Curated annotation (Swiss-Prot):
GO terms for cellular component: Golgi membrane. Residues 1-10 are cytoplasmic. Keywords: Glycosyltransferase, Golgi apparatus, Membrane, Signal-anchor, Transferase, Transmembrane, Transmembrane helix. Gene3D superfamilies: 3.90.550.50. The gene is B3GNT9. One of its GO terms (biological process) is poly-N-acetyllactosamine biosynthetic process. It is found in: Golgi apparatus membrane. It is a single-pass type II membrane protein. The chain crosses the membrane at residues 11-31. It comes from the Eukaryota. This is UDP-GlcNAc:betaGal beta-1,3-N-acetylglucosaminyltransferase 9.
Length: 401
């Protein structure tokens, strides 16, 4: 009898504990539910975005930014993808020696005594030789294009883990990567290499070092296009856009992003803690995949960026430098640093089509093979067979669900 009573008490206690645990889990789940913005008032239409501008908000909760084709998802870690402690300790170190230079890149000649009309500067990494070759053989080819002189440089840092001590670098330590890059520089005369680790959060160092280099070695350049190695650029369309522009006036045009909020999700590639940036939104900036600026703006930015505290996201940092100069980046709908979105009415539409690309200036996110293929589709002997200009899908960038 006593044993039965004890068993009943234990069973009842187990049920009570289970119910209590269930209530606690339910309450925790409700408390962690993502918050949403306040509902819009009935009968009032949402304000439309300014044409050419991208208005998007970073997710506040555990949702990471949408993955694009080719992205490799990384499991979240409790410490985040980046060592901000190390970054904060070293962020004031902003001068690194130039290991490979191209001092004559912007020298003039008989036909072009002032040097190039357009300098193309492409961010790259040491191992990405295939993409550099694709750029050299297609849209980044040097020479005359529509009467303009075009020159090209690639911007690199030292591959991580190979040793970036200034003394070692200046002593010319012969490592595998340095030998290959020096051979590539001798062959193509377009490599700029600085002695900082070539990491995502050091792209800001690449930005300020290039601005300083271009101000010193290309003082008379009219315009500069700066972009990634995985973009396709229609240089003819770019030069048409620049033709009526005065290089002595301020200009920075591209895929302009406004009202972007810092991402506070540790698992995100773009995670920024409040200790690094405490304001609710970034200043307006042009997507780093590709933008164009005048020679006058380049020289002003070189001075402004030398006075702005370094920030680990390079295109946002450039927006901070523009803000210091009280300049506003100019939005251009033909700069597509988020690729070409498929219209909702035609979800199966193939956007990798020369009839789309012939209307654009920059498209981001292409492989080396895609760059080569699109270039030859557009510039082949017959050209693309397009009955009429195709409408390019437009609209503000939206984070996926």
């Amino acid at each position: 009898m006593r044993r039965r009573l004890r068993l009943r008490r234990e069973a009842l206690l187990t049920l009570l504990l289970g119910a209590t645990l269930g209530l606690l889990l339910y309450a925790q789940q409700e408390g962690a539910a993502p918050t949403t913005s306040a509902p819009r008032a009935q009968g009032r239409a949402a304000p439309g975005p300014t044409p050419g501008l991208r208005v998007f908000q970073a997710p506040d909760t555990g949702a990471a930014p949408p993955a694009y084709e080719g992205d490799t998802p990384e499991p979240p870690t409790p410490t985040g993808p980046f060592d901000f402690g190390r970054y904060l300790r070293a962020k004031d170190q902003r001068r690194f020696p130039l290991l490979i230079n191209q001092p004559h890149k912007c020298q003039g000649n008989g036909a072009f005594p002032r040097g190039p009309d357009l300098l193309i500067a492409v961010k790259s990494v040491a191992a990405d030789f295939e993409r550099r070759q694709a750029v050299r053989q297609t849209w980044g080819a040097e020479g005359r294009v529509q009467g303009a002189l075009v020159r090209r440089v690639f911007l690199l840092g030292v591959p991580r883990g190979t040793g970036t001590v200034a003394g070692e670098a200046e002593a010319g330590t012969q490592t595998h990567w340095s030998a290959l890059l020096r051979a590539e520089s001798r062959a193509y005369a377009d490599i700029l290499l600085w002695a900082f680790d070539d990491t995502f959060f050091n792209l800001t160092l690449k930005e300020i070092h290039f601005l300083a280099w271009a101000s010193d070695y290309c003082p008379d350049v009219r315009f500069v296009f700066k972009g990634d190695a995985d973009v396709f650029v229609h240089v003819g369309n770019l030069l048409e856009f620049l033709a009526p522009r005065d290089p002595a006036q301020d200009l920075l045009a591209g895929d302009v992003i406004v009202q972007a909020r810092p991402i506070r999700v540790r698992a995100s590639k773009y995670y920024i803690p409040e200790a690094v940036y405490g304001l609710p939104a970034y200043p307006a900036y042009a997507g780093g995949g590709g933008f164009v600026l005048s020679g006058a703006t380049l020289r002003r930015l070189a001075g402004a960026c030398a006075q702005v505290e370094l920030f680990p996201i390079d295109d946002v940092f450039l927006g901070m430098c523009l803000q210091r100069l009280r300049l506003t980046p100019e939005p251009h709908p033909a700069f597509r640093t988020f690729g070409i979105p498929r219209p909702s009415a035609a979800p199966h539409l193939h956007t990798f089509d020369p009839c789309f690309y012939r209307e654009l200036v920059v498209v981001h996110g292409l492989s080396a093979a895609d760059i080569w293929l699109m270039w030859h589709l557009l510039h082949g002997p017959n050209g693309p067979a397009c009955a009429r200009p195709w409408p390019v899908p437009a609209g503000p960038f939206q984070w996926g669900p």
